[in-house]
Amino acid sequence: MKIFVTGVTGFLGQELAETLISHGHEIATLTRNVARGDRATNTESMIKGETISGVRYYFGDLTDYLVVSDALKDFQPDVIIHLAAQTSVAYSFTHMKEVFDVNFIGVFNMSEAARREVPNLKRFIWSGSAEEYGIQPEEAYPTKEDDLQLHAASPYGVAKIASENWLKYLNLAYGFPCVVFRNANSFGRKHSHQFVIESIIFQMIQGKSPIKLGDPEPIRDFIFEPDLLDAYVMAAESNSSEILGEAINITTSEPISIRDLAAEIAKITNYHGEIQWNSFPKRALEIPKLNMDNSKAKRLLGWEPKHTLKEGLNITASYWMK
């Protein structure tokens, strides 16, 4: 198949593109030729503008509709996997317009250009987020996809909900073949320690005391990068029409507080120092709990995580401790 993947300079995108190529698919992407954020591998080469072997490159910005439209019209993909996004919730509080431009306008441009220019598109797979659930009553956990109102608790969440609503509108109005993944907090990064698990590991292996962390009380679900990658590959290669128009939780469904998460990582890294909690300002609207049910992914995709949270933590820590 011909698969258009955005975000190939990101945490998941490069490895996903390489995996799909190894499966015999033809891959294209849109890039500004400047890597930003996290890279799963080969960071320096991506910054220098070197390319992934076997990927066809179109150059431009996702926020430029004409650039997006021309690329999709030329490539005519069977499947689009839209990963490109500004991924930091914290960043969204201080850079609202940038986050909305990338995380909503980028989705609008990709999907509308695909609807108009790619008549034989089979699937448009988009990365939503657990953040879309926001603050829910305790009895709602673990949250399922179809029986809850979404509540944004950050500018990031607002943009994600807007994007999902737009895609679902296209599906209902025009039969647009979208698939929405509501992803748990992902981890397994090899070149960035700006997210919670990698930050804790990085600080602990430095051996300094105290390490500085934020609020210890929020409870979160996580998903290990190889398991998240599997979900995208399975959705891309699926022939099932049941997944079209659906939102699907991608998570290990192993909720853990940040305090307990840090304690688990301390065991793995043999850290015995102090943790200085609440070292950073709290979010304007903190979500106390994000815990999702993954039964729909098992039922519709045949997907389930191959790694427990603890197994993923051990593998990630082992990489950083090399």
Regions found by a protein language model. Give the residues of each.
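C-terminal substrate-binding subdomain of Rossmann-fold SDR/epimerase-dehydratase oxidoreductases
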Residues: 19, 205-322
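Residues in well-ordered alpha-helical elements
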Residues: 66, 78, 90, 97, ...
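Proline-centered turn/helix-capping motifs that create local helix->coil transitions or kinks
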Residues: 125, 132-138, 175, 191, ...
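A glycine/serine/threonine-rich, flexible loop-to-helix segment
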Residues: 138-141, 193-203
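Hydrophobic alpha-helix immediately C-terminal to the catalytic Tyr-X-X-X-Lys motif of short-chain
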Residues: 162, 166, 170, 200, ...
